[in-house]
Design a protein with these regions (language model features):
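Short, solvent-exposed, polar/charged sequence segments at loop or secondary-structure edges
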Residues: 90-134
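A mature extracytoplasmic/lumenal domain signature
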Residues: 58, 95, 129-132, 148-154
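A structural "domain/chain start" motif
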Residues: 25-96, 208-226
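Short secondary-structure boundary motifs at beta->alpha junctions and helix caps
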Residues: 154-213, 217-220
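Extracytoplasmic/secreted cell-surface and envelope-processing proteins
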Residues: 63-64, 135-139
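Envelope-exposed proteins and targeting segments
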Residues: 48-54, 78, 121-126, 142-149
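Sec-dependent bacterial lipoprotein signal peptides
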Residues: 1-23
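Stable alpha-helical elements in mature extracytoplasmic
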Residues: 70, 74, 78, 109-113, ...
Length: 226
């Protein structure tokens, strides 16, 4: 065999080997994904296991209709998820905290989160402030969207736990957008109530995800922390 033929045969053999290797990689990658699973996003903050209360505020009337109902639902849902995922072992009814604040507001007295936490017996308070809560991001697209910001307060030591002191921002921002919904839902009271429930679930779920390692959502609502 001539040197040229030998070199050609060697090149063909190398090419075949590389092709086989690449083919094997294409097979192995999905198999490895199934075996190991998708990469999880780490928690932004791990809550301390202390008596915790969730407070949802809407000082700027971001929720246009039934603000109190939506705020209670979000706070209740976050509280249930904290307990079900064992992120904390003791929570205080958010409705008690929000009712206390509402009663003080009626008397013209604005209570601080520190005072509310102390009064209801909490040692840790998750404060969520609603910034946007709409059935559509542009009044055209039928895709409910909401935005809020939050912080975790140490009631005992009177300091902010998350974001930590010295962080670039004092708040953790969360933007939530559900999957598109049928335009028909906007045309009835029952449909609009369903949209509200979708947003409540999306907000509560994405807020809670900040506190534990999780798989990023591929369908449904999406989280954009800033």
């Amino acid at each position: 065999m001539t040197a040229e033929r030998t070199a050609g045969a060697l090149a063909l053999a190398i090419t075949a080997s590389v092709a086989a290797l690449l083919s094997a990689c294409n097979i192995l990658q999905p198999a490895m994904y199934l075996a190991v699973g998708p990469t999880k996003v780490p928690a932004r903050y791990v809550l301390e296991n202390r008596p915790t209360v969730v407070f949802v505020d809407d000082r700027n009337n971001a929720i246009p209709i039934n603000s109190s109902r939506a705020r209670r639902a979000i706070a209740d849902d976050v509280t249930k998820q904290l307990m079900s995922r064992r992120l904390v072992t003791q929570t205080i009814s958010p409705r008690d905290a929000m009712a206390l604040a509402r009663n003080q507001d009626r008397e013209g007295k604005l209570m601080s989160m520190q005072a509310i936490g102390e009064t209801v017996g909490a040692e840790q308070l998750i404060y969520i402030e609603m910034l946007r809560y709409r059935g559509s991001p542009d009044n055209v697209t039928s895709q409910p969207t909401a935005e809020c910001r939050l912080k975790v307060i140490d009631i005992v030591n009177k300091t902010r736990l998350f974001p930590p002191p010295g962080a670039e921002r004092d708040w953790q921002a969360v933007v939530v957008q559900t999957a598109p919904v049928s335009p028909e839902l906007y045309r009835s009271t029952a449909g609009r109530r369903q949209i509200e429930q979708l947003l409540v679930a999306a907000i509560a779920g994405q807020v809670t995800q900040l506190f534990y390692k999780h798989i990023p959502d591929e369908l449904g609502s999406r989280l954009t922390p800033q």
